[in-house]
């Protein structure tokens, strides 16, 4: 209800976020986050959720936040490693921001069941190298069986593994 009523229609609220006037707003009050808000100029609740998810050392240090902002503002083209990733990553302008996206990518590209995708997500989050290595092989084989380029699939797996070092599920963000 809150999402539907306040954040769809309250332009003044969004203006406060766009101006970085978020002192006292949990998760949005640090000076770094206020800088990001001023640059990103959020216009919808999904923008705020993505920014909160991406405001972590990994994405900040890797340039993912800058990519998200540039793509959101149309200053940079949204690029997907494979066309099948567009429906999974469109809401975040081609940037992996949530654990659910890792699971969907595993399912879409490699044919993982949701159970297997969750095993991969957990292994990545807990840095269980032995499980990740086994799942990497299954991911690459599954992607190849579906006609995907193995090198692209490997790059995508590495992106997912990198993401797992900082990622949360969407509802946590």
Q: Which residues does each PLM region occupy?
A:
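Mg2+-dependent phosphoryl-transfer active-site scaffold
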Residues: 3-167, 173
């Amino acid at each position: 209800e809150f999402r539907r009523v306040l954040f769809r229609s309250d332009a003044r609220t969004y203006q406060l976020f766009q101006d970085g006037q978020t002192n006292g707003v949990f998760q949005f009050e640090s000076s770094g986050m206020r800088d990001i808000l001023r640059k990103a100029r959020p216009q919808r609740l999904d923008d705020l959720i993505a920014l909160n998810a991406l405001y972590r050392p990994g994405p900040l240090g890797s340039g993912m936040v800058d990519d998200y902002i540039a793509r959101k503002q149309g200053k940079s083209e949204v690029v997907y490693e494979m066309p099948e990733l567009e429906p999974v990553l469109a809401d975040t302008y081609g940037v992996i921001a949530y654990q659910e996206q890792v699971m969907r990518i595993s399912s879409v590209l490699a044919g993982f069941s949701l159970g297997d995708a969750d095993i991969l997500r957990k292994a990545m989050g807990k840095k269980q190298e032995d499980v990740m290595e086994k799942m990497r092989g299954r991911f690459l084989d599954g992607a190849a069986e579906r006609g995907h380029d193995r090198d692209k699939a490997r790059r995508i797996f590495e992106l997912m593994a990198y993401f797992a070092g900082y990622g949360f599920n969407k509802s946590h963000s």
